[in-house]
Amino acid sequence: MDPRERVPPGNSDEETVGEAFAWLERTITELNRVAVNHLPRELIFQVWQRSWAYWREEQGMSISYTKYRYLLLMQKAMFVHYTKGCRCLQEGHGPGGWRSGPPPPPPPGLA
């Protein structure tokens, strides 16, 4: 067996998977903390709610997969925001008040 294809000593598959889940949680939390300075909080909540409703409830995917899909959507939203010329820290942004009723539960890191 090629030594490059072996798992390094002290790294079992369970540890690697656990590290991936921990990374996903840390990344989502950090992304949400940054995104709240650039995108309306309501938009972030809506992306979280719709990701959960579609990927978890409708498609029956795992919680980690749902979080991963949310992460991809938010990364894309932040990328588009920055490429359009971010001026949020100088000018700020509105609350995104297009939705009536109570706000949805917050995503991880914004509770």
From Swiss-Prot:
User: Could you tell me the Gene Ontology terms of the biological process aspect for this record?
Assistant: symbiont-mediated suppression of host innate immune response; viral life cycle
Q: Where in the cell is it found?
A: Virion; Host nucleus
Region (Binds to human NUP153): which ranges? Answer: 60-79
In terms of domain of life, where is this protein from?
Viruses
For this chain the motif Nuclear localization signal maps to 64-71
Matching entries from Pfam families are given as: VPR
Quaternary structure, per UniProt, is: Interacts with the P6 region of unprocessed GAG. Interacts with host VPRBP/DCAF1, leading to change substrate specificity of the CUL4A-DDB1 E3 ligase complex. Interacts with host NUP153.
Name the job this protein performs: Plays a role in nuclear translocation of the viral pre-integration complex (PIC), thus is required for the virus to infect non-dividing cells. Targets specific host proteins for degradation by the 26S proteasome. Acts by associating with the cellular CUL4A-DDB1 E3 ligase complex through direct interaction with host VPRPB/DCAF-1. This change in the E3 ligase substrate specificity results in the degradation of host SAMHD1. In turn, SAMHD1 depletion allows viral replication in host myeloid cells by preventing SAMHD1-mediated hydrolysis of intracellular dNTPs necessary for reverse transcription.
The family classification in the record reads: Belongs to the lentivirus VPX protein family.
**Name of the featured protein:** Protein Vpx
- Tell me the organism's taxonomic lineage: Viruses, Riboviria, Pararnavirae, Artverviricota, Revtraviricetes
